[in-house]
Amino acid sequence: MEFHNGGHVSGIGGFLVSLTSRMKPHTLAVTPALIFAITVATIGSFQFGYNTGVINAPETIIKEFINKTLTDKANAPPSEVLLTNLWSLSVAIFSVGGMIGSFSVGLFVNRFGRRNSMLIVNLLAATGGCLMGLCKIAESVEMLILGRLVIGLFCGLCTGFVPMYIGEISPTALRGAFGTLNQLGIVIGILVAQIFGLELILGSEELWPVLLGFTILPAILQSAALPCCPESPRFLLINRKKEENATRILQRLWGTQDVSQDIQEMKDESARMSQEKQVTVLELFRVSSYRQPIIISIVLQLSQQLSGINAVFYYSTGIFKDAGVQQPIYATISAGVVNTIFTLLSLFLVERAGRRTLHMIGLGGMAFCSTLMTVSLLLKNHYNGMSFVCIGAILVFVACFEIGPGPIPWFIVAELFSQGPRPAAMAVAGCSNWTSNFLVGLLFPSAAYYLGAYVFIIFTGFLITFLAFTFFKVPETRGRTFEDITRAFEGQAHGADRSGKDGVMGMNSIEPAKETTTNV
């Protein structure tokens, strides 16, 4: 299939229509039904971003709440060590919940489907929001910690559900662009949490429980809207054998009556699945055709978290303060705005430049910026302009993250696997993401204490390593169906078994589908 773009298109809508029109000879539309379904799904991504960023701004106030509550109960103030440990637990237990939730993705999606799973787990969001929102009234530190654990479980599940659902309902030529919307939801959630966390909005001593409990509202909104969204047609046909329903949903989502080629691809995959036993987590590592894609998936997730991005956002206020910024919270919000803008840019680029290229550009830019951050922090006391260099390096660091390492690892996992192993793969990849997230949050303060400005050199080393791995090991998936990608890995695994060599270079040499002339 050779495609080549012609005509001028402006705006996000025009860009998406341009991509869609290149899928097949007949014209497809970006339908309201497709946009609505993806938008509703990304509310789960928003929840993940919001609850990741919401705990940072009210840190001092929440510590005071913990101190006062424990003092009133014990008639004596807690030790500084206990206070610090309880605060750290309140932050870190969110990631523990995320690890458990992400590893449980397959238990839900195979039993209830993609859409219904998103609907059911909103009960966790409501429960976690209530626990956190009422902890001050109840004078209970335990409710705060338990609420963070429950909302972490919810967010961990969402990190598997949302990319999987979006990938399965999106046309092949739009899969990357729409997959990026998952990351856009996350960064908007982080930005909203930063803004709401300002003392003049919800970050005050009186309103911080409302700030934490706000997560109930998106859960209610998504629960009301999800029944209007279709189930994944791939799930209906491949897992439930409901071909007629799947065909009807594809026609409505993609705006065309001719979906026979896509239905046939799903039927072929379904036939192959019926000859295989159910894929477990262990099978992903035992079967040669799954082993390489799961390793790629894990490393790409690690490249996101070990890039240092969460260290920047978790401790951004302190970093800006160390850099000499008088109002560091506003500088942190500026980083959140940059985060959002460049995620939108990635939406435009991912189907043109490709996943692999953008990921390498992002990693390379971040490696340079993390080195520059180290230099500027070391020299800021000697040269006045170094504070501005540090801020600039952080903003460009964030921009590079959102070009590649931010959005791509989430949706590329769904692309690398067929319907059978996909839930298990999403669980493993998501758990590796949350685990590395937890370790960065746990270890970064100590590393920063002992290493000072040199701490970001550690991330530079990781970034260079991940850049090399992406160059040598990660294939390009742009413009390829799930079936194409699966067969390529299977053929590569068989070739590697026969030759005794790693066939990954063959995958890297596979060129994505080129464009053919179409008029929009």
From Swiss-Prot:
**Binding sites annotated in the UniProt record for D-glucose:** 183, 304-305, 310, 339, 402, 410
Against CDD domains, the record matches this protein to: MFS_GLUT_Class1
Q: Subcellular location, in the record's words?
A: Cell membrane
* Protein's membrane topology: Multi-pass membrane protein
Which ranges does the record mark as transmembrane? 30-50, 89-109, 118-138, 149-169, 178-198, 208-228, 294-314, 329-349, 359-379, 393-413, 424-444, 452-472
What's the further remark here?
GLUT14 is a recent (less than 5 M year old) duplication of GLUT3.
The similarity comment for this entry is:
Belongs to the major facilitator superfamily. Sugar transporter (TC 2.A.1.1) family. Glucose transporter subfamily.
Q: What is this protein called?
A: Solute carrier family 2, facilitated glucose transporter member 14
Q: What is the lineage of its organism?
A: Eukaryota, Metazoa, Chordata, Craniata, Vertebrata
